[in-house]
Amino acid sequence: MTSLTGKVAWVTGAGTGIGEAAALAIADAGATIVLTGRRPGPLENVARRMNEAGIAHVQPADLTKADEVRDVGKYIRASFNRLDILVNNAGVNIVERHWDKLTPESIDTLLEGNLTGALYCVTVALPFMREQKDGLLIHTASMAGRFIGGLSGPIYTVAKHGIVAMSHGLNMQECVHGIRSTVFLPGEVATPILDKRPNPVGPEARARMVQPADCGDLIRYIACMPKHLVMNEVHLSPSHNRGYLAALERQI
């Protein structure tokens, strides 16, 4: 495995789930990690798991607030004066996902939490990477970012399609600065966001899903790829296809 020693990575949504797993995996490859999320407690827990090497730095922020995102950027500038990797992972969903239940407030929550915050993070990361003529952006979208379905809800789907478009647009414009962008589209992953599903997901079903550590390993692999390559888009799903099997049962 290629070493990431000397690299600085900023991981958002780092307190749980995919973000936590990505932070641990990239740290294991030697990178210094800046952990960001809304809640300091989970971030501190993640930091304690990697801080024997002194490589974790906790910077809580509400990524829907541009000034708080800029403050994290200022911390990175003052502490390291470089940023090599952004894992743009923070995201949210809600229980009431159907059009007849949506409100202006819930629409704002979904768009700001899944798309606006990610855009803010990119605008903070790019100046570092342009200066360095090198940098990698990895964005967690969802299968909902490429395919239309009823499970994730329409506004979440809109936001994740935006993440996909953002990443491909970054590769078009920023390649001249040595910057690469990957959009990661996982299927069902056993993370706390499942608790927001309208119908509860039991432990047996969760055990068959993609696990956060699987995502962390993939993100580390992307982070260690040679600079002359870019993985534009990558899908990862469980081999147990719950959607197909549920449809089959309904047909029977």
Features from the language model and the residues they span:
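Conserved glycine-rich Rossmann-like NAD(P)H-binding loop of the short-chain dehydrogenase/reductase
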Residues: 31-45
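Conserved mid-core segment of classical short-chain dehydrogenase/reductases
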Residues: 70, 93-108, 152-155
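C-terminal helical subdomain
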Residues: 176, 183-184, 203-245, 249
